[in-house]
Structures are given as structure tokens and as C-alpha cells.
A protein has these predicted regions:
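Short acidic/glycine- and proline-prone juxtamembrane loop motifs at membrane-interface regions
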Residues: 33, 127-138
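Perimembrane helix-loop-helix junctions
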Residues: 1-2, 153-157, 176-204, 208-209, ...
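Membrane-proximal lumenal/periplasmic loop motifs of glycosylation machinery
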Residues: 25-37, 48-73, 77-78, 84-87
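Membrane-lumen/periplasm interface segments of specific transmembrane helices
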Residues: 20-21, 25-28, 191-269, 300-307
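Membrane-embedded, lumen/periplasm-facing catalytic core of multi-pass transferases
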Residues: 356-409, 419-424, 430, 436-437, ...
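Signature aromatic-anchored transmembrane alpha helix within multi-pass, membrane-resident enzymes
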Residues: 11-16, 162, 178-179, 197-205, ...
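Hydrophobic, aromatic-rich transmembrane alpha-helices
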Residues: 16, 182, 252-297, 301-304
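Hydrophobic/aromatic-rich transmembrane helices and adjacent perimembrane loops
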Residues: 132, 138, 167, 176, ...
Length: 498
């Protein structure tokens, strides 16, 4: 296959095009999801221990795997702002992901125009920009996976294993590379690199050891995750079963976030690459570009199958837009490769195919842009309530706050032990009120959710009605996407009276 060299000015241009919106977003856009504020808290805690020299290996243990938090904590030693350190690190990984998509596409297609189109598709994607500016693991994890794929295409199996291992210390789903990369190498070269295999085994062994050192149970993290999963289904029984509206909603979210054209091209490329007459990687006379496309297809469908299986077995009860980001990143080189193959096989329809793909990509980007704006509106409403709590709650007091809006709780910066949720309190009216009094609950964050006890017992609170028990202190809402939050001061004196 022909290999192209890049003009000297190309890389700086690509870095600027991908970097400007992501670095700016890190400073000016809010985090796209409430989990980001938990990451920020963990980054701050870890950074403080690193600065004071009290950091221990067991401090890596937590609900999530620790690599992203650790990298951000090291950066925060110099930046000294945990909020922006996590966002800045994610933005850098987002820039790197864009550059890797360009490099992988160029390697697959030997066509710079196709590579630049693929780069533009990810560099200007609203969802990718939004999450590159958020302190979360989705984009850093995608970077490590893309880097691993790049070295697989180069047959650099040890380096591919190194980046796959880094992905495996970022998110647990990348542990499947223990099987995926050796399988690809065996099918390609009829051998397996023992060094690469040993490197791939490091993430699970490392995490089991950390869990054992921190808790005495090498599976403690998975026990904790299963407990959270069971609690989530208990609090939201609708998530434990499929309904047509929920399946349609989740399917639409996954399809749009992955990109319709990308998803279709992945299935087309899989059919091209694995049809019967090209059944083995090593078949004599098989064109190199047909061999090479198989690795990206295997990567794509490994993660796609894992996500779909988790959803169908209720291990992943709902689909969020960010779940499609990795598939989108892996699928762009496949899309460009498929476009070129279809154009070669049917030149008369090449223009029609290109226009159709562009139309689908523009449609997807438009939907994602609208969704990102709505998500930012929701975050602004949540931030207003969180800021009020942060300013008015005395951290030295022994009172509690009731909140079924977890994002508000995390955003407030108040220790999570100060918050109570519906899962902590009795569900009957008398028991609920007695518990408020017993725990000295000072504030109640009211959201009209089906699983929220206050929403069921006191429906009048959704309109800001003042009662003997609850006095409204602020209201924050967004019209698109809908978010409506009332903050009430609890009158414990009235609660105490029969």
C-alpha cells in the first residue's frame, strides 16, 4: 500500500483545529455529566496527598479505575485547580484522539483527503467537543484504544498492548483486549507475542491487588458496583424491564451518538472484510487494505457487542450519549475506508453515496448540538441550586440535606455523607417526617421524579407551595431540556408536632 508523507504545516494545523474548541470548552463549558464532579473530588483528594507526600498505593482504590484521576492529580500539582485540571487533561486527550483518527484513516486508505474528512468529522463533532471539555474518562479511554489500534495496524504488538493496558487501567471494559489483540496477531501472523500478552494481563492483576490491599477483598470494586446496580434497579423498577418507549429512546441515543453513517459503514465493512472468499488474514493474494480493515472492525464490534450485551442483560440499564463516543471514534476510519471501496466498485453512484453520508453526518451533528445545548441548560439549573447550598450550608453543622438530584449533591462540594436520598428514608408519610426530624434535615432538594419519596408524598411542592413543613428558598429550571428543581428549607419544629 502506498504511504503518504504529511506536509510540515499539517500537524500544527490539525492541532489548532482540534485544540481551540476543546481547550476553550475546558474553561468555559460546564461538565456534561454529574459523574465529572465526583472525578474532580477524587482528583483533588489524590493531588493533595501527592503534594504532601502522604500518597499510598491504596489511595488508587475507588469505584472507578484510577489512571485518568491519577494523571489529572499529577497535573493538578502544578495547576493547583482540581476543577480545571481534570477538564484540561480530558481536552488534551480529545486533541490526541482527533490526531489518531487522522493517522489511522490515512494508514487504512492511503488517501489524505479521506483522512482529512475523518479528522474534520471528529474534530468538529459537538458531542466529542463537549465530553473532551468534561472531567470524565470517556475521551481519555478512547485515546488509549485508538492508540492501541494504530499500533496494531503498524504491527507494533508490544506498543499496542501498552496502550491497551493503559485503557484497561482507565475503564474495565478494555480488559477484553487480553483476548482481542492476541487473536488479531495470531490471525495475522500465526503467532502470539508473549511480551504483549503479559502486558495485557497487568490491568486486572494490578486492580485485584489494589482492591485486596485497600479492602481485603480482591473483588471489592465489583461487589460495590453490583450493590450500586441492585440499588439503582430497586429505586427505578422500570429500568429492570424493557418497554417499547425506553428501548426506542436508548436505541436512538446509541445510533445518533455513534453516528448513523458510521454504524452502517461498520456493518458494510464487516461484510466486505469477512465474506467467505477472504476468510483468513493470511490468504495468499489477499490485498493488504482488506487485511488491514479487519482490525478496526474487530475493535469496533468488540465494544459494540459488549455494550449491547450489557444492555440486554440489564447490567447497563440505560444508554447515555457518551456511550457512543468510542464507537464513533473507532468507526470514522472504517467509514472513510468503506466510502472509498464503494466508490471504486460503483463509480456512477460515488457522488450520491458521498452526499448521503454528508447529509447523515450533518443530521447527527445537529441532533448532538441540540442535545448538548439542552444538557448545558440542565447543568446550569443544577449548578444554581448547588451554589446556593454551598454558600448557605454550614459544613461544621450536624444537619443533613435531602436530595434525590445526585448531580446537585456532587456539584455543591458538600461531603456526600451530609446528603440523604429516598433510599435512606421511610416511604410512608409519618416515618418520612419523623426521619427528617431525627436527622436534623435542613434543606430538601425537590425534583419531580417517580422514584422520589417527597414527589409522591408532597406533590404540591412541585409548584413551590409554602407549607407549614417546607418553605421554598429558591427555584431553578430549564425549559430545554426540561429540568425543574425547588429548594426548600425544612421546618423541623413543625415536623416535630403531631
Amino acid at each position: 500500500m502506498q504511504r503518504l508523507t504529511n506536509p510540515r504545516t499539517l500537524w500544527p494545523t490539525l492541532i489548532l483545529v482540534s485544540g481551540i474548541p476543546r481547550i476553550a470548552g475546558a474553561f468555559f463549558l460546564p461538565n456534561a455529566f454529574g459523574d465529572a464532579y465526583v472525578y474532580i473530588r477524587d482528583i483533588g483528594t489524590m493531588s493533595t496527598k501527592l503534594s504532601h507526600g502522604t500518597f499510598a498505593l491504596t489511595d488508587l482504590y475507588g469505584f472507578w479505575l484510577p489512571l485518568y484521576q491519577f494523571i489529572s492529580a499529577v497535573v493538578n500539582i502544578f495547576i493547583r485547580n482540581g476543577f480545571y485540571s481534570g477538564k484540561f487533561v480530558s481536552a488534551l486527550f480529545g486533541i490526541g484522539s482527533c490526531l489518531l483518527v487522522y493517522s489511522i484513516t490515512l494508514r487504512l486508505t492511503a488517501n489524505r483527503t479521506a483522512a482529512l474528512m475523518g479528522f474534520g468529522l471528529i474534530a468538529l463533532n459537538p458531542l466529542h467537543i463537549t465530553y473532551s471539555a468534561s472531567a470524565m474518562t470517556d475521551v481519555p479511554h478512547a485515546f488509549f484504544v485508538l492508540a492501541s489500534l494504530y499500533f496494531v495496524l503498524q504491527r507494533g504488538w508490544v506498543l499496542a498492548a501498552v496502550f491497551a493496558a493503559l485503557a484497561g487501567i482507565t475503564r474495565v471494559e478494555s480488559w477484553m483486549f487480553i483476548a482481542v489483540i492476541p487473536a488479531i496477531q495470531f490471525l495475522r501472523e500465526r503467532r502470539i507475542s508473549i511480551t504483549a500478552l503479559l502486558i495485557l494481563l497487568i490491568p486486572p492483576l494490578f486492580w485485584f491487588y489494589i482492591s485486596w490491599r485497600a479492602t481485603g477483598n480482591w473483588l471489592a470494586c465489583f461487589v460495590q458496583r453490583q450493590y450500586y446496580h441492585d440499588w439503582l434497579l430497586a429505586m427505578n423498577p422500570a429500568l429492570a424491564r424493557f418497554s417499547l418507549p425506553s428501548v426506542l429512546r436508548d436505541s436512538a441515543i446509541l445510533i445518533v451518538s455513534t453516528d448513523i453513517a458510521v454504524l452502517i459503514s461498520a456493518f458494510v465493512a464487516a461484510w466486505f472484510a469477512f465474506r467467505r472468499r477472504y476468510i483468513t488474514f493470511t490468504r495468499p493474494g489477499m490485498p493488504e487494505e482488506w487485511r488491514m480493515i479487519r482490525a478496526p472492525v474487530v475493535f469496533f464490534f468488540a465494544f459494540f457487542s459488549l455494550l449491547v450485551t450489557a444492555y440486554l442483560t440489564h447490567q447497563q440499564p440505560m444508554i447515555f450519549p457518551r456511550y457512543g463516543l468510542l464507537l464513533f471514534s473507532l468507526g470514522i476510519p472504517i467509514l472513510m475506508w468503506t466510502l472509498l471501496r464503494l466508490a471504486q466498485q460503483n463509480p456512477q453512484r460515488a457522488r450520491l453515496i458521498l452526499v448521503s453520508v454528508i447529509a447523515l453526518c450533518v443530521f447527527d451533528a445537529s441532533v448532538e448540538l441540540v442535545g448538548s445545548v439542552g444538557s448545558l441548560n440542565q447543568t446550569s439549573a443544577q449548578r444554581a441550586v448547588a451554589d446556593y447550598l454551598h454558600a448557605h450550608v454550614d459544613n461544621n453543622a450536624n444537619g443533613f440535606i435531602f436530595s434525590d438530584e445526585g448531580t446537585v449533591s456532587v456539584m455543591s462540594g458538600i461531603p456526600e455523607g451530609r446528603f440523604l436520598t429516598s433510599s435512606d428514608l421511610p416511604r410512608d408519610g409519618a416515618g418520612f417526617l419523623a426521619f427528617l426530624k431525627e436527622k436534623h434535615v435542613e434543606y430538601l432538594v425537590f425534583v419531580n421524579k417517580g422514584d422520589s419519596t417527597p414527589a409522591r408524598l408532597f406533590p404540591e411542592l412541585q409548584t413551590g407551595t409554602r407549607t407549614e413543613l417546607f418553605a421554598p428558598v429558591m427555584h431553578s429550571s430549564s425549559r430545554f431540556l426540561r429540568m425543574d428543581i425547588w429548594l426548600y428549607r425544612v421546618n423541623n419544629g413543625a415536623v416535630a408536632r403531631p
